Amino acid sequence: MYLGIDFLITPELKLYLVEVNVGLPGGAHEYHLTHWVHLGKASDIFQRIESTSQKIYGKTFTDYLHSLPFIDSLKPFKIWMDGMGPFPGTFHPGLRLEDKWNQYQLLKAIAPMPETMIFDPEDTGGGNRFVKRKKKVILKRRVGRGGRDLQVITEPSSLWKLNPVSNPSLLQEYVESKINGLSLSVRSVALGGEFMCMYANLSTRPNSNHGILTFISPGNPFGLSEKHFKTELFNQKSWEAEIWFGKNEPEYLRHNLYEEEVARATLIIPEPFLRKIKELSIKIERIYDELDLFRLPKACFEE
């Protein structure tokens, strides 16, 4: 199953899995841009995805993607998640993979993940104990993207001073994933039991989604090749958007689907650590590919 898998990395080189994205998440296009800026030439990522799809699934990648049983429900579901459309008229249990609590339950035994609990606004004791024990946590939606409504909590009292939480949410252990003062995450892409590509996101915001795209190179020590780097801007329709939407992309997503900023620098990561990311990505992809979607626990949006 084609996946976009998000990791955090602490300054001490501890790796945490935080999220898995299904359908056609970003990743290949972003990697391609970082490859272009860093090496001055096009990557072969799209050809590799296509050849892997044909080798493993016997279909072109577009045909493979549209053969997924939940894909027709997932497209309107993503727009519903953004608050820009109705809940899909046709439901498929594969949508339950969008509930981050389900992801946590599914993967916490096989990958290091920040400790997470369901946030219950009526259970003040449980939330207080979690914040006291972890010192710093984040409150985030169980179903959502783009870091919408994400908040950093450092005191139990602040948890209950928040505006009423209208969406089912999680409390999650805060992981300090920063480099040179910038928030850092790594997006890895896997398909058909094979690792495809990875790149880094850098941001001045607490969450690094849709940040500055950065090429990843093996080496030592862990860090950026340039402390103060320039960036290059791109404004072109992504490969994913063309396949997913064709000519009918929603106007509100234009920034996400077209505009990217790429660092003229690389994130240097030791080779054994890169290997760990690749191995975990393949392991997670195999688990997802072999899931019986009809046996997934119900998601929060079904309750």
Regions found by a protein language model. Give the residues of each.
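Glycine-rich phosphate/pyrophosphate-binding beta-alpha loops
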Residues: N21-H29, G147, N201-S208
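Active-site nucleotide/adenylate-binding loops and adjacent lid/helix of ATP-dependent enzymes
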Residues: G89-L184
